[in-house]
């Protein structure tokens, strides 16, 4: 009879910050390690890249400090970032540019980013844990964990790597495209960002497949920076 991995007992044992290592440990003990966590940031932004990170942590590393990167302060994430880079057995960060998000759609770009992040690890994982949804096409077994960035250590580490990497890029982007406030809102659709979009029109880093960006382009008949032609969108999205 076929065996389903990981066994249900492993899933039941994991959960909560105390159990952050339980799922990874049980997978390792079952001969399915090393275990990699993968997570993304920037799905709901209407500007900037989608950033995906994969991470394989050493046993017992940073458990008490890790949590979903969205719950940590910016200072806390910045403090954790070099520690994760130092103590992780392997990690890899992938940037999916806005034009690729427009061409393929957020979901397809997200899955492709996760594949690339896992493929880029210097240590081949035996098992992959992803945050929230299944990642088809991986060369190793995988399991989605709902809310994984808050209950699985390697996913939490990947979440921090992705969040800090993207935030730093958006701060640098603010200097390249002044007036949009990228350093403050990181490309998400705040009131200030919407106002800047209306006044300035979109720049090459905006996602034209997102309906709020397309609406402004259509309404104002605005052109982006000279020489840039947005790719036709594969699907529509909107900032959340």
UniProtKB/Swiss-Prot annotation:
CDD domains: RNase_HII_bacteria_HII_like. Manganese or magnesium. Binds 1 divalent metal ion per monomer in the absence of substrate. May bind a second metal ion after substrate binding. Its EC number is 3.1.26.4. It comes from the Bacteria. It catalyses: Endonucleolytic cleavage to 5'-phosphomonoester. PROSITE patterns: RNASE_H_2. HAMAP family: RNase_HII_B. This is Ribonuclease HII.
């Amino acid at each position: 009879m076929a065996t389903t991995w990981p066994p249900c007992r492993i899933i039941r044992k994991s959960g909560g910050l105390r159990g952050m290592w339980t799922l990874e440990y049980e997978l390792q003990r079952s001969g399915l390690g090393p275990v990699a966590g993968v997570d993304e940031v920037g799905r709901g932004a209407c500007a900037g890249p989608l950033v995906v990170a994969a991470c394989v942590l050493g046993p017992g590393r940073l458990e008490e400090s890790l949590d979903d990167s969205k719950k940590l302060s910016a200072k806390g994430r910045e403090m954790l970032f070099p520690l994760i880079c130092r103590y992780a057995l392997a990690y890899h960060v992938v940037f999916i540019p806005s034009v690729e998000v427009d061409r393929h759609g957020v979901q397809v770009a997200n899955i492709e980013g996760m594949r690339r992040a896992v493929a880029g690890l210097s240590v081949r994982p035996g098992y992959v844990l992803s945050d929230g949804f299944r990642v088809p096409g991986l060369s190793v077994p995988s399991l989605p964990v709902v809310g994984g960035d808050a209950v699985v250590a390697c996913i939490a580490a990947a979440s921090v790597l992705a969040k800090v990497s993207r935030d730093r890029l958006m701060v640098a982007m603010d200097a390249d495209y002044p007036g949009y406030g990228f350093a403050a809102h990181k490309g998400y659709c705040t009131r200030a960002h919407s106002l800047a979009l209306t006044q300035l029109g979109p720049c090459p880093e905006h996602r034209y497949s997102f309906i709020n960006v397309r609406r402004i382009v259509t309404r104002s008949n605005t052109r982006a920076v000279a020489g840039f032609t947005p790719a036709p969108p594969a699907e529509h999205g909107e900032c959340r």
